[in-house]
Amino acid sequence: MDPESVGYCNNPDFLHKGSMDELYNISKLTDDIKPVEEKWKLVPAFMKCRGLVKQHIDSFNFFINVEMKKIVKANERLTAENDPSYFVRFTDINVGSPTSTEDNLDSVQLTPQRCRLRDMTYSAPIFVNIEYTRNKQIISKRDVHIGNIPIMLRSSNCVLSKKTPEQMAALGECPMDPGGYFIVRGQEKVILNHEQLSKNRIIIEMDSKGLPSASVTSSTHERKSRTGVTLKNEKLYLKHNTFGEDIPVAIVLKGMGVETDQEMAQLVGSDDVFLNAITPSLEECQKCGVHTAAQALDYLGSRIKVFRRPYGVQNKKTKSEEARDILAGVVLNHVPVRRYNFRLKVIYLSLMIRRIIMASKDKSCLDDKDYYGNKRIELSGQLISLLFEDCFKKFQSELKKSVDQAIAKANRAENLDLPKLIRTDTITNGFTHAISSGQWNLKRFRMERSGVSQVLSRLSYISCMGMMTRIQSQFEKTRKVAGPRSLQPSQWGMLCPSDTPEGEACLHPDTIITMSNGQQKPIRQLKDGDSIITLDPITMEAHSTRIYSHFIKSSSQYGKQLLKITTITGKEIICTNDHRFLTSNGNWKQSKDLLLNDKLFLISSSNQLEFNNNNNENNNENNNDIIEILNENQLINQGVVPIKIIQELKSIELLPLLNNNEKLITISRIIGSIDKIGSNKQNEPIIQYQFNLISDFDQFLKDLQYLGFINPIYKLNEEQQQQQQQKIDHQQQQQQQVEQQQKSIIIDFIGSSFGYFIQSLLNEKNWIEKSNNQFVKKEFLSSFISNVNRIQFNIIEEINQQNNDSNFKILLNYKQQKQQQNEKEERAVVDHDNEIFNIKSLQILLNQFNVISSIDFEESNLIIINSSLKKFIDLINIKFNQKLNNQIIQIREYLNYINYNNNNNNNEEINIKKKDFGYFKKLKIKRNSFEIEIEKIEQLNYQDCPEISDFTTESDYHSMISNGFVSHNCGLVKNFALMSHVTTDDSEGPLLRLAYNLGVQDILLVTGEELNSRNAYLVLLNGQIIGIHNSPDYFVTTLRKMRRAGRIREFVSICKNKAQQTISVACDGGRLCRPVIIVDDQRPRLTQEHIEDLKDGLRTFDDFIREGIIEYLDVNEENDSFLAWREAAIQPWTTHLEIEPFTMLGCVAGLIPYPHHNQSPRNTYQCAMGKQAIGAIAYNQLTRIDTLLYLLVHTQRPLCQTRTIDLLNWYKLPAGHNATVAVMSYSGYDIEDALVMNKASLDRGFGRCIVLKKQVTSIKKHGNDTSDRIFPPTPNDLRQPKYGLLDSDGIAKPGELAQKGQILVNKYSPLNTIDATPNPELIPDSAYKSSYMGYKYDNPAFIDKVLLTSGDDEQLLIKMLMRSTRRPELGDKFSSRHGQKGVCGIIVKQEDMPFSDLGICPDIIMNPHGFPSRMTIGKMIELLAGKAGVLSGKFGFGTCFGGDRVENISKVLISKGFSYGGKDYVTSGVTGEPLACFIFFGPIFYQKLKHMVMDKMHARARGPTVTLTRQPTEGRARGGGLRLGEMERDCLIGYGASALIMERLMISSDRFTVYACKNCGFLGYEGYCQYCKSSVDISTIQIPYACKLLFQELQAMNIVPRLKLVDS
């Protein structure tokens, strides 16, 4: 052996060194690990390979180059129906470059900028190579155009791909633009990242009763379903929506083929803990009499929910066969079952049971509901891929129809030219519509989503970047969280901890929410655990869901504007400006983005009932006085109800029936709908119902299932039954179903538990009439009135012939029932002798709701008098008579419309013509038996509200019914961290083979004992159990070594869970992962040499991955690893090292200097305000014509930078100024964060911005060949100011100053656009009407640009860009980068400002009280760093967890002759004397926010008033004033300003002179008292008109207010 190779001990030179300490010093075994210098260089290297937006682009490229070809390959062949020998085969597909065809049919290259300006779609043609047969010959065609696809900017097919900055500039693009979005019809659209709950994974959580339950969301291409296993009374049950009740798991396992109890026990676990836990479930199986698989399937078949089939369509399968199919294909449908071999599914279900038992004994076995390893992210490529597959299959089906039609004609078949049959608009329109609307309605994939794409925010460069990295969680299964901003440890390094919403979207606390039981409550009265109605935004189907995280907070905490939205019928809601509403096109839209005349979805329902404090929260009788309406003894005493029926009613909690039972509301509705009741010869009760439509009967069945009658026994009316049993062919059957929809349906319930229950309940007299629950009465009334056979509901519309007005009258004709005898059934159906079915008692019930009616006993008519018509219409809400409900809804909204417009119109009452009523008929649509109305917005006003409230729902649909509006509840918005990456799907096959090669035993070959042995670890691949392994460490270590060696993909995750004894291998897409440095034996594999190679360009980030120096970890594998924060923190057990600490933040939070010194909410606030800061958006900002652009005139690079600013190149497009700030108190105008600003600084351009707004019109070509025209102004026109901007061509001149109402384009449209016109060019000018485009904004602006171009439809497009320059004024909002915003409180001349000994005057003075409560220490350090940077000529760095240290900054300040603490000697500008203390003085980067006084200020001296109250209108848009509210009034009272109160609340509002009687206190008329019949004691007084109106309305309610007059 070479002695030198042995080591230092054999070296003779070493022996002279002396001690062992020197030995260790030389060997460096005990040295600290030196940190690698400039390790942060790995971050820009990663950004080049992956980047923030690159995952969007890579995802789209993967679709274009790989997925698209796979989809075509899977659907390559079409065969004709008429001739099977004729086929079409798609052999290849490719996407070209973006092009457009002009008028001259030339194809020109499209650029993104051209599409933005011309409102075109930036798309490229899709070409396919095809083969098809013609005359028995195979014809090949190449590059056949089948449609266009929008191209993502900077993707491989984009013209910007691989372009240099110079080439980008030549194309009119900004080199800094990130790409990753689409341009559709001129709008920039981005497909957001969507967060979903990971499918096919078991989740163990606590249910509402505090017991563990397991749930799995199974997802395959065929079906999506949710399966649960719950624990009740120590027994385990399977829960699935196909079964009407929870099924004992032992019966399910038997149905799947597990024959013995011993085998079940072995599958779950042989330990005593598991045996004891499963024994009650096995015993229950025996009690149910289930011993074999056949018995189990029969049991399951009898519990299958009743799903409506068309009448006459019989199910050919038996109940047991149907149950077997449900177990195989619906329950846990992601687990494959081949030839009814349930072995895999049995093991999977056993694992769910085992984990529930473990969780019941040890709470640590519960899954964290927000654990991010259970989430998946969908990228644009995946969503576009689904969209293309759907469009391509539609295209193929249309092509197949065309081919079949062509082949059917012999003369055409021989000369068939297939390319001529191809329609290119199917795919083109499919893409364009989906991306522009954001709706992904793909029925073949059971996918219906809205809001998938959104308009890209261009408020600032960073707002664009922030939106590209946003994660939309609208469609996820939201989990319970401690609070809306709770952080999960699993999000570390994956999601930004700071960039969460500044505040949730919220509502006014008095907003009425519709509960799942039909009640309506103010949101302030809700509490966690309450159930509300939520709606699927696509199908409008109603679901019940619990709420949590309910809160009521001060609105001042959020700093958001509150909006009041009013519709054309007067429906109102107050919400924050980011609260989302469902619009008529199916999209969610924030309230601040709503416009007048936008249409919103509303749920039409009767007005909510008043809640008083005497009732409990459910508005039932007082809990202290609980009464039994029906109990077991009453039924036994009746002697007609079988014991079996009594037991069944007790099991579904309808016996005893108490007056506080929530089901009473549904019961009253069902009782009110009864048509006839009686009994047969066996004395069995017969309950008969009659419905107009099948859908009405479906609603009735849903109510029965809610009560617990899962499979109610009923039969059709005899006549209908005979019709249904006729044997008819398919077409006749369809026709019969259509006819059946038009006939009434009569249903009999004979001798069932439901029948006995109803009969017994009717024997208890007057319980509805005496009930204190108003909803019980209301639902009974609504159903009774809508009864098809008992009440004839007449809506009489009376038309005034003079003015064509419509008036309505309600007439209820009570039909007398007669006893009927049915000989065939040998039963008597008679009317039940009960007071409820009585027209007099109906009137009594109506009177309780202040609905006044009269009775005509001769005709049995009950007439609702006119004064109560609206109350009656608002009261009833019909569920089982859809046809009648539609009519009532139309009248209700019509009356609301009249009432609202009369109350808000200055003139006399408006006349609503009969044609206007037709408007409401058109607005109503019906979806899944829910009444939806679409209403236009009439007003959008800003409001003040001291409190706001909201909550989160547990369901998939985060929607609610609030004041009738379909709105969204609060949720989280998350953003990617800097180095997070989203995986794409990878093939499972190679990993499966590798797992078996590494010793995994096939799960199908394993017994129950082996499955749960101590050494056996279950191996799961993407959630599927594939086998077990007895050496888990070997398996995991080997797989990881192979990944680091590049033998398997770098994004494969391997995770060992010791508690559950599982090894999870994942290669599915959508997992968040991030790169970390591998550590071996306490030494990072990354060395300084590697960094030097990276700096020299010899290595890339991907090289480090391939060499096994860095690897990607997802959230699950992170849990199985130990990560060190820095090199100094490495321990013997450390496996990985972080690349850089600051990468835990996102791109927006990374701009904050020294964020680790700030209070956490401040960083969150800055993330929101940073996106609202005005700055530069792109290099091409002055050539764009966007809807709204804010530009800062002189942007500056911040003196205190961060690494993230360099990485994003934000310093090239900044948003703010370096303001010299003095932290001191100066006058009283700087309290509450207000700023004192230097007038000279504003004169020099500080905070000055440009607002650019677009106005567009087009010259349309109409169907009769006529078109719009632009007329030059006539000499008479030019005398009017509104025509003053027009040039000789009828278009306004650039550079002119436009005022509101002035004409910009003098456009005229033809009067006749329908009838054919022989010579459109010869139409006289008199045949045109003016349709000019005028300047529509309140603030004047200059015409900056005028663009004349044409779009996709080749129509002339005229765009005008309006420019206004704004300098800061009082009330404008500014913010630092630390979440401290403040308005400009006062602007002071420079000579009055304090100045330092160097003569420097501050630009801004801020109050020092802004620091202690906000705790923004980072802002102080930023001032020091900026000051040192100015003096030293270097930029300071305030990177998170790093940056320049305060000690070093202070040394620089001292070396330059300044105070180490940043304080200066300052002299007062007013007195010229030095201030009494040193002032903290230096530069801080300030942002100007988009919130400016000019956009929001409004006031009025005089203007329109409301007709009803004669008070001024409200809202800026309606010329309204500012309301002096209750709190303002109380403040004035406190100051004793009585004259001001009188002036504000009466003289300037609604002063009204009335005559009042001193004797009786009533109001008189024209100096005469009607009550006293005298004019002696009459006095004239002045009161507000609203007060006089209140007195009169109270008198109408029999409340008599009297005035006591005293001589002044």
UniProtKB/Swiss-Prot annotation:
Q: Pfam families from the xrefs? A: RNA_pol_Rpb2_1, RNA_pol_Rpb2_2, RNA_pol_Rpb2_3, RNA_pol_Rpb2_4, RNA_pol_Rpb2_5, RNA_pol_Rpb2_6, RNA_pol_Rpb2_7
Q: Which domain of life is it from?
A: Eukaryota
- Which residues fall in a coiled-coil region? none
Instruction: Spell out the post-translational modification annotation for this entry.
Output: This protein undergoes a protein self splicing that involves a post-translational excision of the intervening region (intein) followed by peptide ligation.
Where is it found, in Gene Ontology cellular component terms? mitochondrion; RNA polymerase I complex; RNA polymerase III complex
Query: Mind telling me which residue stretches traverse the membrane in this protein?
Result: none
Q: Which residues bind Zn(2+)?
A: 1557, 1560, 1569, 1572
The record's listing under InterPro entries reads: DNA-dir_RNA_pol_su2, DNA-dir_RNAP_su2_dom, DNA-dir_RNAP_su2_hyb_sf, Hint_dom_N, Hint_dom_sf, Intein_C, Intein_N, RNA_pol_bsu_CS
Q: What does this protein do?
A: DNA-dependent RNA polymerase catalyzes the transcription of DNA into RNA using the four ribonucleoside triphosphates as substrates. Second largest core component of RNA polymerase III which synthesizes small RNAs, such as 5S rRNA and tRNAs. Proposed to contribute to the polymerase catalytic activity and forms the polymerase active center together with the largest subunit. Pol III is composed of mobile elements and rpc2 is part of the core element with the central large cleft and probably a clamp element that moves to open and close the cleft.
Instruction: Spell out the subunit comment.
Output: Component of the RNA polymerase III (Pol III) complex.
The protein here is known as DNA-directed RNA polymerase III subunit rpc2
Q: Which organism is it from?
A: Dictyostelium discoideum (Social amoeba)
